[in-house]
């Protein structure tokens, strides 16, 4: 008899890193022959709360398999309906995603009901506390997660946070998997650059994803200025691609004040999945200059495309356990001169630090599934 799994979280057509993660995890469970039901959201956020323009990506019309869109954090009646549906499914394991305290009351209710019903549950922790959280977020996280005992973290710092939030928590560490390339047409670097209007002769550094303060775009711009001041910028172009969730004006003013407009291209909108592949195919290297946070989904996408990556030390602690980690250069977080030096290293090491994709991204997802199915940890 197949093992029956219920996976709770956003999937396509919802957009963003967690939806991409949940969709990839669901695909891996199905590929490994599990009896999977995905419980996703009938609605995520009210419009006034969501910082982006829309929380759905309908660009390519794709969806996930075996999904029931019935859970809403806004409606307590849906919490009960979701629990009842899960109970009727009689799963061997329920897996819930945690990344924002906005779900605190809904997740508290659901986890409490699952615990009382004796249904084995694991919580995948993306961020124990929101990146830009306040004091109340710690209280909300403790309130929600206190009804769980078994957790999977993908970053050592999150393990420490969960220990502080949940007494007696059983915690597994599994590195964040490497994303598979988007299911879009494979084109050459030259074709991708022509498509995006980029210079074919320059080395392209890519900064990709929702732009928020902790992701370090300001540090990258400071590093680009240093390269410009040293006369080292002529061979480079930096592509900033993503929707601004933070004050766009301060970054555009900085680009102008630094006189680096000719070397920075900004695509200031959400990049849908059916276009995202072109950005990674056009790039020579990827930059993740985070000043805070846990792990970067965009970084794992870049690794999936085999790009050399320059990564701040603040999010680098889980990378060494992943395949292809030899393609990573780490700089001291918030240190623009160090980042500038590492960018020069990329240029000088072009013959030895070449991107490649050896197909190991699938193994990293299988490793996550294997970790989730450690039966001793879930009491069987």
Residue ranges and their predicted role:
Residues 308-313:
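Short hydrophobic beta-strand element within catalytic cores of glycosyltransferases
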Residues 278-294, 307:
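Acidic donor-binding loop of glycosyltransferase active sites
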Residues 11-15, 27-88, 158, 163, ...:
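N-terminal strand-loop element at the rim of the active site
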Residues 146-187, 373:
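Donor nucleotide-sugar binding/catalytic pocket of nucleotide-sugar-dependent glycosyltransferases
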Residues 198-215, 221-224, 239:
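Conserved donor-binding/catalytic core segment of Leloir-type glycosyltransferases
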Residues 348-379:
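A charged, aromatic-enriched C-terminal amphipathic alpha-helix characteristic of glycosyltransferases
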Residues 70, 249-270, 325:
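Nucleotide-activated donor-binding/catalytic signature segment of Leloir-type glycosyltransferases, i.e.
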Residues 41-45, 237-250, 269:
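Glycosyltransferase donor-sugar binding loop
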């Amino acid at each position: 008899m197949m093992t029956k799994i219920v996976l709770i979280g956003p999937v396509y057509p919802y957009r963003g890193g967690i939806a991409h993660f949940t969709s990839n995890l669901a695909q891996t469970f199905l590929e490994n022959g599990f009896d999977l039901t995905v419980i996703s959201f009938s609605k995520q956020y009210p419009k006034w709360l969501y910082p982006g323009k829309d929380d759905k990506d309908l660009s390519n019309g794709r969806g996930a398999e075996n999904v029931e869109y019935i859970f809403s954090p806004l409606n307590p009646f849906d919490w009960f309906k979701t629990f009842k549906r899960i109970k009727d499914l009689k799963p061997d394991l329920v897996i819930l995603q945690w990344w924002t305290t906005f779900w605190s009351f809904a997740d508290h209710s659901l986890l409490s009901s699952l615990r009382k019903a004796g249904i084995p549950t694991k919580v995948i922790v993306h961020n124990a506390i929101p990146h830009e959280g306040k004091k109340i977020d710690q209280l909300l996280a403790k309130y929600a997660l206190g009804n769980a005992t078994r957790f999977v973290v993908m970053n050592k710092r999150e393990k420490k946070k969960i220990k502080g939030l949940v007494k007696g928590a059983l915690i597994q560490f599994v590195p964040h998997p490497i994303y598979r390339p988007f299911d879009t047409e494979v084109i050459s670097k030259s074709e991708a650059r022509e498509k995006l209007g980029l210079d074919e002769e320059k080395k392209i550094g890519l900064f990709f994803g929702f732009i928020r303060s902790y992701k370090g775009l300001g540090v990258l711009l400071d590093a680009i200025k240093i390269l410009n001041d040293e006369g080292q910028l002529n061979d480079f172009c930096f592509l900033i691609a993503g929707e601004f969730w933070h004050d766009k004006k301060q970054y555009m003013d900085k680009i102008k004040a630094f006189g680096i407009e000719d070397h920075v291209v900004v695509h200031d909108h959400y990049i849908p999945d059916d276009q995202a592949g072109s950005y990674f195919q056009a790039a020579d290297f990827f930059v993740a200059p985070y000043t805070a946070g846990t792990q970067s989904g965009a970084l794992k996408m870049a690794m999936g495309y085999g790009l050399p990556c320059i990564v701040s030390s603040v999010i680098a602690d889980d990378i060494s356990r992943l395949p292809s980690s030899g393609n990573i250069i780490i700089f001291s977080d918030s240190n623009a001169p160090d980042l500038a030096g590492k960018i020069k290293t990329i240029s000088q090491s072009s013959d030895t630090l070449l991107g490649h994709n050896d197909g190991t991204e699938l193994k990293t997802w299988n490793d996550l599934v294997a970790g989730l199915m450690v039966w001793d940890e879930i009491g069987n």
